[in-house]
């Protein structure tokens, strides 16, 4: 990342076991809601007032472990981007890496290529001091994805589609796919945002799937948690990741490591490749840069992967084909205010959307249960109903 740690004095080495214990005790505790006066005061803060100082005042009211998904935020702390778009962006930016796996007949080599793709789905947070918008129930996000194949040719029949299928708990179902190739990656998990004292922990609670129709194979993967280091101005993945196939006994276990306060590297990880209980390979490096693989039988180390720099071209629907539930429509008022640097306007437009959603939720209590429009649950998995050719 090339950044230097900032404000390290506020984030000292702590007893992680004690933090996790407190987090478990407060996991279901609602986040305190700031009053309108509190929010306005933060937006009206004197020019030059440290954003971190304002955050420090705000989090004094929050207990460790509190779910902060729905915490009130002043306009100056709103990132004008729907969370719904993150999953699609992350999994489509380098979708070409997954299409490469569809041309690999060797089972182990195909799994290694899938793991390369999964490394590309890891991304750093744009702004650790701003919170993206929580998607409303039924909100959607879609686009056409243009990638390069192994020969440098354009492949344009790739798409992503996302829908917010649940509000309590917040669940987004996102699919990136190429129907012609029979390649599909679906990410559909409850996401928990917890305040952990000096950072925010984003957990993806469950498994996601990648399918290759050509090989009649389904991969299951578990994404590592993310730690947003508020006072050090960066984010990182810390924890475990797993990749396995339903066709064989190959398994990849990854451990993502935290950047120490002093020294160390950003975005470090180590993965081990197994066949059954036998360890075959070790992959090590930084997921944002270079990675090497070591054959544990011969102890030979060779380059494994370097993260690509050129991402996919994203083509959004034109105005005539944009759904009324699209994020660009739902949050248009917030986005417009953001372009004008009108932080109070952002707050006001956000409140308008949220108040309308509360009214709709009240009406739904007396009606049938809300059902997703674009995804159906088939064999226990949420799947996109209509795939584009």
UniProtKB/Swiss-Prot annotation:
The keyword Calcium does not apply. Keywords: Coiled coil, Cytoplasm. Residues 1-31, 340-371 form a coiled coil. InterPro entries: OSBP_sf, Oxysterol-bd. This is Oxysterol-binding protein 1. May play a role in the regulation of the slug-fruiting body switch. One of its GO terms (biological process) is culmination involved in sorocarp development. Belongs to the OSBP family. It is found in: Cytoplasm. Interacts with dstC. It holds the Pfam family Oxysterol_BP.
